[in-house]
Amino acid sequence: MGPRLGVWLLLLLAALLLHEESSRAAAKGGCAGSGCGKCDCHGVKGQKGERGLPGLQGVIGFPGMQGPEGPQGPPGQKGDTGEPGLPGTKGTRGPSGVPGYPGNPGLPGIPGQDGPPGPPGIPGCNGTKGERGPVGPPGLPGFAGNPGPPGLPGMKGDPGEILGHIPGTLLKGERGYPGQPGAPGSPGLPGLQGPVGPPGFTGPPGPPGPPGPPGEKGQMGLSFQGPKGEKGDQGVSGPPGLPGQAQVITKGDTAMRGEKGQKGEPGFPGLPGFGEKGEPGKPGPRGKPGKDGEKGEKGSPGFPGDSGYPGQPGQDGLKGEKGEAGPPGLPGTVIGTGPLGEKGEPGYPGGPGAKGETGPKGFPGIPGQPGPPGFPTPGLIGAPGFPGDRGEKGEPGLPGVSLPGPSGRDGLPGPPGPPGPPGQPGHTNGIVECQPGPPGDQGPPGIPGQPGLTGEVGEKGQKGDSCLVCDTAELRGPPGPQGPPGEIGFPGQPGAKGDRGLPGRDGLEGLPGPQGAPGLMGQPGAKGEPGEIYFDIRLKGDKGDPGFPGQPGMPGRAGSPGRDGQPGLPGPRGSPGSVGLKGERGPPGGVGFPGSRGDIGPPGPPGFGPIGPIGDKGQIGFPGTPGAPGQPGPKGEAGKVVPLPGPPGAEGLPGSPGFQGPQGDRGFPGSPGRPGLPGEKGAIGQPGIGFPGPPGPKGVDGLPGDAGPPGNPGRQGFNGLPGNPGPPGQKGEPGVGLPGLKGLPGIPGIPGTPGEKGNVGGPGIPGEHGAIGPPGLQGLRGDPGPPGFQGPKGAPGVPGIGPPGAMGPPGGQGPPGSSGPPGVKGEKGFPGFPGLDMPGPKGDKGSQGLPGLTGQSGLPGLPGQQGTPGQPGIPGPKGEMGVMGTPGQPGSPGPAGVPGLPGAKGDHGFPGSSGPRGDPGFKGDKGDVGLPGKPGSMDKVDMGSMKGEKGDQGEKGQTGPTGDKGSRGDPGTPGVPGKDGQAGHPGQPGPKGDPGVSGIPGAPGLPGPKGSAGGMGLPGMPGPKGVAGIPGPQGIPGLPGDKGAKGEKGQAGLPGIGIPGRPGDKGDQGLAGFPGSPGEKGEKGSTGIPGMPGSPGPKGSPGSVGYPGSPGLPGEKGDKGLPGLDGIPGIKGEAGLPGKPGPTGPAGQKGEPGSDGIPGSVGEKGESGLPGRGFPGFPGSKGDKGSKGDVGFPGLSGSPGIPGSKGEQGFMGPPGPQGQPGLPGTPGHAVEGPKGDRGPQGQPGLPGRPGPMGPPGLPGLEGLKGERGNPGWPGTPGAPGPKGDPGFQGMPGIGGSPGITGAKGDVGPPGVPGFHGQKGAPGLQGVKGDQGDQGFPGTKGLPGPPGPPGPFSIIKGEPGLPGPEGPAGLKGLQGPPGPKGQQGVTGSVGLPGPPGEPGFDGAPGQKGETGPFGPPGPRGFPGPPGPDGLPGSMGPPGTPSVDHGFLVTRHSQTTDDPQCPPGTKILYHGYSLLYVQGNERAHGQDLGTAGSCLRKFSTMPFLFCNINNVCNFASRNDYSYWLSTPEPMPMSMAPITGENIRPFISRCAVCEAPAMVMAVHSQTIQIPQCPTGWSSLWIGYSFVMHTSAGAEGSGQALASPGSCLEEFRSAPFIECHGRGTCNYYANAYSFWLATIERSEMFKKPTPSTLKAGELRTHVSRCQVCMRRT
């Protein structure tokens, strides 16, 4: 234990020393430099004070730099269960789920689209016989027939005459001419039947026959619903019926109501009715089920289904291994102060912290004890600092004391003097607090700054009151007393353009000469160069000569709106204005008669009407009175600084007239000129009426009018403007005058403007020394003179009382001065608050201290040797004026100085005495032109005597100046009509017209196309039972019928005599007994003797007869029954032909065809059975249900499979055609299937073709019992099978081998009950088994193999009652682990264990954590002050500041990519998306965020999806809106497509900034300033909102940079559509912040409309600012 304690003591001592050393360094560092001023901050460090109160919570600081990676902390405790996490990403697709339960049958679907044409239907019935057609045209004549048979002999004719016959000779006569045709013979016998001729043309249909008698009821046919036929044409109306005959009916007695007659014959068809179409009927009953349809083709794969319901929560996974430590996270943002945690373990020692902010000033501490004196070490003189800020204006100094004396020349600056002795330290008032010094004197004016940007247009000023009666001559007062010299003024306004004098050289300064004689008159000089510019508002230059006309200038840009000018003089009446807009409709006025023209009335008071239209240019008005000074003009060019004005010089000689110069700029209005010569009287003008209108356009020059008659003499006019100077007249005779009397001295005049610089005079004669004048006022500082020659070294002067000189070079060390008296002891300060435990960081430099009391002067030191010159010191402040020294001796005359300003004009001298009158001289030569005389006074002088005689004819003068514009001429003749103009652009659409009158109803339309077939209706309700028909005639006896169907079960017969019957059916299940308590396990028993067989149980009572069930599946073949009693003899069969001896007999007779059963639901395809019968396997676990396989080709007939589960309802298929009758199949074994659930009614399918004869199948497994189904619909009757041919008579056969057992015969009548059978033999004794343990219930096994065929029972029994509880199954598999349980209650502390064995020595441990602070040690002795440390080496460059991911988006509103503002980095460029509109709803983007800058452009940048997993793109009327460029829209206003869209879409840039960005808005036309600490990124206009199609749109947050667009446009965006077009539309509006005057804040806004050119005068300006980092 000892060594370890020693180590701890050493560590503690080192820590204390380190702590003391750092405290001392901190104390010393407080006041070591020279920057502490006069504060002495040394002192002994006081004891550690009490801990202060906790301060207020500070504001959240800026995010710090990313620190270095910290050490890995210990693993934390297990946390509480967290909040549920965000939904994870979508997992991989799971296996198909178990099929759900069949849903309820759906509602009937919407009728589908028309299917393809079906197969040809069954031929329809013969149509009715048509009516007889019209008679056809006669046929062509037939061919000639064959010769007929010879006719009968004719009657005997008369004897003929023989002409020219010699009797006795027989002469043969000539052949006679053919005779006439004989009469037709009688018809011959009919000939043999000829061959069948070709079919003739279809004859016309005959008339309808009478209705036949009702036929016999036919067999029930197969009904197929054919397609609905088209609606037939309307038939021709029939002939009118016969008129009825009127009969007289006598009213008889009331008859009794007769019996209901028999149903009459069907009537003839009636005429078509005229009823309206009825309402749709109610749905009928359900129709009969159709046949199964054909198998459809395999469908295309379906779309992915909707997500299933969430599954059950999975089991908890195993706990994973501990992960590696992640990288340190970014510093989090403090959202709120959490609850105080428990005190943590002491951390590792931290690095030195950064310098903290300067803390608040503490209360003054207790004064420390004085420290030892420091060693004075003079510091190096620093380089000159930058000029300080301009100080405030100092107080005016005291007037200087002056002794008279001549002023000597300025001497050269002497060499720097030795430094003075050091002063005594100043006394403090006890509170060591540095106060700022007094304000310094005013510094010299700074360098002029860069010219500022052009300012915004000023706001319109208030209208000024006009000064109606102002005489400016009377307003000017007498001159005031001389004021003190003013500050140097700003440059004045530019003066009128003066003549420029030639610059003279600087001459030597001459002595004043005596008064010279007046010189001769010189020649007029040439026109001078322009002179220096000066400005005096009291002087106005003469009007310049008119110039040559200049070239027409280029058209200027549209200027900003100017300020309102002074009201002009009233103009003459203007021409009528242009047609105004259509006003509101006024009330109708009465028609007045035109009045006669009245006299011109006196001028009325000024009206307050609207500003009239622009009038023609008026004639020149009378000169106005001088106006009040105007508003300051625009900022002029920088003026040249000129000397202050001197007194006016003597008037110069007049120059000769120059050439006509160019026209000068328009001058400022001149002051009124001297009175001119009396002008001719002017005509009296018409008095003006109304306020002056704006100047009208320049009218066309009129034709010169005819000369008018001379006017009446007018009244005397006002003085005219001064005339232009005329050419010089001829030289007059010299006048003779007397000198006038001495005038009184005049009132001092207003100071004149400085005269022009005079010519250099020659050197004058030196004057006598004047008397010493009084001291003059301080003159302005002259320019520096040239350096003088080095004078001899003067004797040392009396020490002046002046300001301290510049710091000289350091002198050698002088002897130490005597100590000054101690300072006044300060008052005791307030006790300070206890300080913190550790020394704080070095504070900032304190403010300047109060000056201490001046110490007594020390003894002067010995003069030091000349030191090396020091660096120039900081210039000292300007000293106060010193006391004047005694006058020195006059110096030798210096070189000529710069000529002084011209002196003020001297007073008039006294007049000299008049001389005697001389003799008259000879007439001299004609003299030169004399100086112009002073203007004569016009007081009390007779104007008549002043007029001279008429002079000689003058020479022709030079061309006079251009005259003023003439007055308006008479109107000219009308011009030629102009050519037709081009057609204008279409106008705006007119207003909506009134609704028109209803039109005449149109003619009926053509019949519409055939409608599509309606959906299959539900079957109708059954119709009412028809009336019994008339009994038909007696039919012929029928053939013997087929064997009848099995009859109903007859009543029980009397007991028969016969063999005892079989045991009865199994009785009903008895009720289950109560479970017994389990017995104890018995001993193994010994083998018992075989028991007796039990007696058969009693027969159960017969159940009540149930409803007839639906036919079940055929049962298994029953055991061969005992021979029954003899049956009734059958009907005699037909005799067969004798047959040959047959082989082994075939299977029994073909059964009767059964009636169609209800179509069952289709079972799933069964697996092929195993051959043979195996041993039963172990029960397997229940497998998952497999997915349904594709439909295969039809296989061979398999063995019957397990009945399938209940299928879902299929869709209704079309009825299939009737199949051929199949071949008889072989008898198979049947299993009694379960009773199936009632399936939904399916469509009848096509009957399959007969398959090949399959082998007999194995007996099937017993199916699961289904739920009881509802009774099905009755099936349609099947078609009767064909009757077989009768066989031949067979020979008696040989005894054949026994045939296969025939099919089960019909059930015979019940037999007589039998006797009891004999007792069977006892069975063999079984082996005794071991008793097994009780197992857990097992899982349900697969169904076992089929048992042996059971006896066939006719009626399936009802289900029995539940049996007794079976034995327990085997132990099941282990279940999955259960869910995590709730956290248990903390257990109690266990008992301590036994002590363990002592372990081996452990490895040395790691360095322990910092222990708690020890108690403070005793106070140490003060150490000596340490020396100053060396300056540290330059630190490494700091890490660059991290951008904190502040994003800002800038839009150029042009096709150029914008630049990111300074201080930000580009991330990417894109296209400026403003908002999108889908499904008539808009969603906007904030233009200041990155979402408004899409990397790619499309007129339809989005698609839309629905819940059916279907998405559509560019398929309907959706829009997108983009910021646009100034590209003008095409003149055709057609939509823009393709590449032509590119110039219309604005580009944008997404930039990353190092700090927050926001927008500020001024709500004026001035650009707002960024807040303190923020810098500007760009300026713009305040954009708030936008809408377009359907009045939908969005807006910008005013704090976002997106609300400050750099360009103002009334249509800043363009609309694009999914069909690939873009355009501007009239329903697009943009909304901007307006300007608001402070005085208009809570008043009703004044409505106004701004036209193009003045839109920006009411839009607020804005600036986007970024916080400085």
Swiss-Prot record:
Lysines at the third position of the tripeptide repeating unit (G-X-Y) are hydroxylated in all cases. The modified lysines can be O-glycosylated. Contains 4-hydroxyproline. Prolines at the third position of the tripeptide repeating unit (G-X-Y) are hydroxylated in some or all of the chains. Residues 1-27 form the signal peptide. It is found in: Secreted, Extracellular space, Extracellular matrix, Basement membrane. Residues 357-366, 396-412, 485-494, 847-871, 1030-1040, 1101-1114, 1193-1212 have a biased composition (Low complexity). Residues 1445-1669 form the Collagen IV NC1 domain. GO terms for molecular function: extracellular matrix structural constituent conferring tensile strength. The modification 4-hydroxyproline is found at residues 603, 606, 623, 626, 629, 632. Residues 347-356, 586-595, 758-767, 797-817, 1011-1020, 1290-1299 have a biased composition (Gly residues). Residues 50-1445 are annotated as: Disordered. Residues 254-263, 289-298, 497-508, 535-545, 937-955 have a biased composition (Basic and acidic residues). Residues 173-1440 are annotated as: Triple-helical region. The modification 3-hydroxyproline is found at residues 204, 207, 210, 587, 602, 605, 647, 1214, 1424. Disulfide bonds join 1460-1551, 1493-1548, 1505-1511, 1570-1665, 1604-1662, 1616-1622. There are six type IV collagen isoforms, alpha 1(IV)-alpha 6(IV), each of which can form a triple helix structure with 2 other chains to generate type IV collagen network. Interacts with EFEMP2. Belongs to the type IV collagen family. Alpha chains of type IV collagen have a non-collagenous domain (NC1) at their C-terminus, frequent interruptions of the G-X-Y repeats in the long central triple-helical domain (which may cause flexibility in the triple helix), and a short N-terminal triple-helical 7S domain. NC1 domain mediates hexamerization of alpha chains of type IV collagen. This is Collagen alpha-1(IV) chain. The lineage of its organism: Eukaryota, Metazoa, Chordata, Craniata, Vertebrata.
